[in-house]
């Protein structure tokens, strides 16, 4: 909205309370008042226009506002006065978010439906006055419309029609579709062809009556389905606002305009966030609600369906799914039909592609079941365009981090219970900042067109028959989702300080060194952004460090030379979780500096060769979004920035570490060490392959884990994922996929000449003492 140009506000109805709310809002925002008279070319107009009047109390239809004539007159003014440019700003004012029900009831009396009568509006404001939301849409230039479409009445009619559709979509995006009654839901799911066939199959295979099989299906839909209550959402909003104010210093939201635009264009929105904590369920829903969007139906693990939390989650829009559908065709059919019903009715949905919470802080390889069911729903025909929205969620303090690390060390996962809930509430404290970044949406229709041009032909195929292209397409989609999540990463103080301290030799740094390093790294990412979607704090390094120290994760000791900062006793291992949240941002700069420090200087071409060799492996492990060519171009840009920032120096063709007396030297040294554990893990696997030459995958994973555990004990590595079997398995898969390994007829893995060259590159980058120990450990193991 350009405040220097005249503005007219366009509202759906001429409600007095809406106008009063708008007046208060414009005053707070410094915008022109909607009650002022607007003078254009010597003529006076109202600053507020309405599509229709409110519903009369005793008549079925409202009177016309004559808005088409007003717009026609305004367009004529623009035709006659070339310098005139009026901005039309659509404003949607809502009270509450009740979507209404299929069967009208008393609650509908206060549902803010289109053009309510003054009496209904009185009740609405009386009961929902605190739940007022005012949404300003992008200003529309009357000059641009007049120049492009002319100035006759047909254009005014078109503008009114488009505005009416816009407000309908705006309402839909804020309240969602009308809620299904339980009986209607049951009839829709249990009466579908797929579920009827599954019931018949259950009856035959289990040798039970048709009624018994149908009762089982009824039990499943009762177990699965959400029971959305808008009143609980409003109550939760007030409660969570108090909790967030208590435990968070703020919540940063990035790129929310993307989801608002999708909703305005009538898209079915599927949110696919990373999963760090149980807090994700609440935080993302809270953010979406405060962005003026309807809260989604959320896929939650059946482990959360315990009294009373399960009932509260269900009323907040959660639907529950089992960890495995294997072997239960009836459950699969019921769940799939319920999910398709949500899509077809227009409910936004949220599910976690990782399947569970990350215990290491890095993204987990995705579980593809929900994505596969989403595509299968597309095959059956979803009426609206479907967009998948990856979401990055980050915290400066995760309440479960201690239990995560215990699980990584072998402890059994504790079952969720009321005791855990009350314990978590009791421990609520300063959790720093929360971050929610909406990544680049994936238009599912377009994705299928690009990868499977004939996908629509499968709509007439048998519903239970899986197309041959489905699995590859789902795997590609899943990888796309994960890379877009990481692409939208949020750099924060806790993660940055953790990365610096864990990269230092004794996990202790002076305050000046830590501040310098944090500032240097932020400057580097500002000069060469990791992506357009990644966010960097606006704070200075000094402010960021000060706020980070308040989180209570660090010891600060002071001597005659200044303050020393280190992790609290035995808590360095916790910092690995926060470091891993952002480690993928440092993959390429870390490799560049590791090569330069290890070789005490190298050429740009040598660095390019190293990146070309290692990037495909890092890309799979860390879900990096750049292609190989883009990674090399990014490397070139980073080298230039590192030189400009004093983190590198150049002599002739050789790139060298900065001079030891330079203030940036310590930052450069830390950067060279931040990828060491990853490289050391690679070295473990490659050295075992070198010694064995041919080895089964299971034996390779087992021996790699044993050697990594030993090295971790020898060097005091504080990172449980260093020997995590899933991380090791992911690296071995990447070696196979990139043809570094050959396969024998029995499936064993064979060390190749190409793999030997890769091992040489990796071994040149790890610490010499680590390389020596690694050689000795594997040699002793083979003897």
Task: Give names to the regions the model predicted.
Residues 1-783:
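Membrane-interfacial terminal anchoring regions of lipid-handling membrane enzymes
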């Amino acid at each position: 909205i350009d405040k220097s140009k005249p503005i007219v506000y366009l509202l759906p109805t001429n409600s007095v309370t809406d106008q009063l709310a708008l007046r208060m809002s414009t005053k707070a925002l410094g915008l022109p008042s909607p009650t002022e008279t607007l003078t254009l070319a010597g003529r006076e107009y109202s600053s507020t226009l309405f599509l229709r009047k409110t519903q009369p109390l005793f008549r079925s239809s409202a009177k016309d506002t004559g808005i088409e004539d007003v717009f026609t007159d305004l367009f004529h003014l623009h035709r006659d006065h070339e310098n005139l440019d009026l901005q039309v700003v659509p404003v949607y004012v809502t009270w509450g978010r009740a979507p209404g029900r299929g069967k009208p009831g008393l609650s509908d009396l206060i549902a803010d439906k289109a053009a309510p009568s003054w009496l209904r509006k009185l009740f609405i404001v009386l009961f929902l006055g605190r739940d007022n939301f005012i949404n300003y849409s992008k200003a529309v230039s009357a000059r641009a419309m007049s120049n492009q479409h002319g100035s006759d009445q047909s254009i005014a009619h078109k503008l009114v029609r488009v505005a009416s559709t816009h407000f309908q979509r705006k309402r839909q995006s804020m309240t969602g579709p009308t809620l299904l009654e339980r009986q209607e839901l049951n009839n829709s799911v249990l009466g579908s062809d797929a579920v009827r066939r599954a019931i018949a199959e259950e009856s035959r295979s289990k040798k039970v009556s048709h009624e018994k099989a149908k009762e089982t299906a009824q039990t499943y839909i009762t177990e699965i389905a959400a029971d959305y209550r808008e009143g609980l959402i409003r109550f939760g909003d007030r409660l969570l606002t108090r909790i967030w104010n208590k435990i968070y210093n703020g919540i940063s939201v990035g790129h929310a305009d993307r989801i608002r635009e999708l909703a305005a264009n009538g898209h079915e929105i599927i949110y696919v966030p990373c999963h760090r904590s149980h807090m994700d369920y609440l935080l993302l829903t809270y953010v979406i609600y405060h962005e003026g969007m309807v809260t989604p139906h959320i896929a939650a693990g059946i482990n959360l369906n315990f009294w009373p939390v399960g009932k509260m989650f269900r009323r907040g829009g959660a639907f529950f799914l089992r960890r495995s559908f294997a072997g239960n065709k009836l459950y699969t059919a019921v769940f799939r039909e319920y999910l398709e019903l949500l899509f077809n009715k227009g409910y936004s949905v949220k599910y976690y592609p990782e399947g569970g919470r990350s215990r290491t802080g890095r993204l987990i390889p995705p579980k593809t079941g929900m994505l596969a069911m989403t595509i299968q729903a597309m095959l059956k025909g979803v009426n609206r365009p479907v967009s998948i929205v990856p979401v990055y969620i980050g915290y400066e303090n995760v309440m479960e981090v201690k239990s995560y690390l215990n699980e990584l060390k072998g402890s059994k996962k504790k079952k969720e219970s009321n005791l855990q809930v009350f314990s978590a509430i009791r421990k609520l404290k300063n959790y720093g900042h929360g971050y929610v970044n909406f990544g680049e949406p994936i238009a599912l229709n377009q994705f299928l067109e690009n990868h499977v041009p004939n996908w629509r032909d499968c709509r007439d195929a048998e519903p239970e028959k899986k197309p041959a292209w489905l699995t590859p397409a789902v795997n590609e989609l899943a990888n796309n989702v994960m890379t877009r999540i990481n692409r939208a990463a949020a750099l924060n103080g806790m993660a940055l300080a953790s990365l610096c301290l864990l990269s230092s030799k004794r996990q202790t740094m002076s305050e000046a060194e830590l501040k310098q390093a944090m500032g240097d790294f932020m400057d580097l990412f500002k000069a060469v952004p990791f992506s357009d979607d990644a966010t960097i704090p606006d704070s200075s390094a000094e402010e960021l460090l000060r706020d980070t120290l308040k989180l209570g994760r660090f010891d600060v000791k002071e001597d005659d030379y200044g303050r020393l900062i280190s992790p609290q006793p035995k808590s360095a291992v916790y910092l690995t979780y926060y470091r891993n949240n952002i480690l993928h941002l440092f993959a390429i700069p870390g490799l560049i500096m590791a090569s330069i420090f290890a070789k005490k200087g190298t050429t740009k071409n040598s660095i390019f060769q190293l990146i070309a060799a290692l990037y495909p492996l890092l890309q799979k492990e860390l879900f990096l979004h750049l292609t190989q060519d883009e990674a090399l171009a990014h490397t070139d840009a980073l080298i230039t920035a590192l030189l400009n920032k004093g983190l590198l120096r150049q002599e002739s063709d050789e790139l060298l570490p900065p001079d030891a007396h330079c203030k940036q030297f310590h930052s450069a040294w830390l950067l060279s060490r931040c990828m060491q554990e990853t490289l050391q893990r690679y070295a473990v696997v490659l050295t075992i392959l070198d010694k064995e030459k041919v080895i089964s995958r299971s034996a390779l994973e087992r021996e790699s884990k044993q050697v990594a555990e030993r090295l971790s004990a020898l060097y005091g590595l504080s990172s449980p994922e260093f020997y995590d079997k899933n991380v090791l398995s992911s690296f071995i898969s990447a070696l196979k996929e990139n043809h570094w390994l050959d396969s024998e007829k029995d499936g064993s893995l064979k060390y190749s000449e190409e793999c030997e060259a890769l091992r040489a590159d990796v071994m040149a980058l790890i610490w010499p003492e680590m390389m020596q120990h690694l050689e000795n450990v594997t040699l002793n193991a083979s003897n």
